[in-house]
Amino acid sequence: MKLLLLLASVLCLALIVSARPSDETTDQESSTELSEDTSDSYHQEEDTSETGADAGTEDGNSEDDSSELESSSEEGHEDGSEDATGEEGGAGEKGEAGEEDEAGEEGEAGEEGEAGEEGGAGEEGGAGEEGGADEEGSAGEEGGAEGGEESPVNTYHQVHNLLKNIMNVGTKNNYLKSFILARLQERLMNPTIDLVGSISKYSKIKECFDSLADDVKSLVEKSETSYEECSKDKNNPHCGSEGTRELDEGLIEREQKLSDCIVEKRDSE
């Protein structure tokens, strides 16, 4: 029994000893396989990561390109919208400006038309007034000459027109002419008009004015001669008044004669 146990023990030891190298080999092989598998897995992971990175880069580039295209399209759309809006705004402004110009032209044309109508009306009114005055003067003259209907207004118009014609002197020297007209206005026109304002029949006093125009013309010519003589003295600054002194005195006498005639004719039957 002891021998059997000893043999069994030896066999067991032999088996154990013989089995240990194979296990180590197996362990080495298994560890080698594991390391190879790990290396392969690591390489696969690197390849996968590189592939993923490349894919991610490509995707990023694609996304960037897509975003750039989208932004470009959006900018183009915005630019187009702005251009369209600008064109519409420009067209609107041009349209408004055109309407304003047309309205301004129509307003100016209307104002010019109104001004023309008013001017035409004014001219027609002036012409009518002048025509009426001429007709009244002509009618007054005819009435006075023919002994028709007369009035103080008619007498006033007749005398006023007659004196205006007398005051239309032909003196060439304007300085002297201003003195002559002032003398005629003061000494002849004003007192005579005041005197005839209440006379109804011009025909009664008409003959008092027969020689008045010639008498005044003679006095004016004498004043022109006196002024020329006075002007020879370059140091005399009073030739205007000195040259018309005789005219002033002569008009006083002539107006007194005219007034006496008018009063006499007015008071006669």
From Swiss-Prot:
Query: Where are the annotated segments for Mediates binding of host collagen and inhibition of platelet aggregation?
Result: 148-269
Q: Which residues form the signal peptide?
A: 1-19
| One protein family per Pfam | Aegyptin_C
Give expression by tissue: Female saliva (at protein level). Distal lateral lobes of female salivary gland (at protein level). Low-level expression in male salivary gland. Not detected in female and male carcasses.
Show the segment(s) annotated as Disordered. 19-152
Induction trigger: Induced by blood feeding.
Identify the main location.
Answer: secreted
Example of a GO MF term: IgE binding
Q: Where in the chain are disulfide-linked cysteines found?
A: 208-261, 230-239
Q: Which GO terms describe its cellular component?
A: extracellular region
| Key words, A-Z | Calcium, Disulfide bond, Hemostasis impairing toxin, IgE-binding protein, Platelet aggregation inhibiting toxin, Secreted, Signal, Toxin
Q: Where in the cell is it found?
A: Secreted
> Which stretches does UniProt call biased (Acidic residues)?
56-73, 98-121, 131-149
Origin: domain of life:
Eukaryota
Renumbered to this chain, region (GE-rich region which mediates binding of Ca(2+)) spans 38-148
Functional description taken from the UniProt entry? Modulates blood feeding of female mosquitoes on vertebrate hosts. Inhibits collagen-induced platelet aggregation in the host via preventing collagen interaction with its ligands: glycoprotein VI and integrin alpha-2/beta-1 (ITGA2/ITGB1). Inhibits collagen-induced increase of Ca(2+) levels in host platelets. Binds to host collagens. Binds Ca(2+). Prevents a decrease in platelet count in the host blood after collagen injection. (Microbial infection) Does not affect the development of Plasmodium berghei parasites in mosquitoes.
Which family is annotated? Answer: Belongs to the aegyptin family.
Tell me what else is known: Protects mice from collagen-induced thrombus formation in a murine model of lethal pulmonary thromboembolism.
Protein name per the record: Aegyptin-like protein
From which organism does this entry originate? Anopheles stephensi
Classification from the root reads: Eukaryota, Metazoa, Ecdysozoa, Arthropoda, Hexapoda
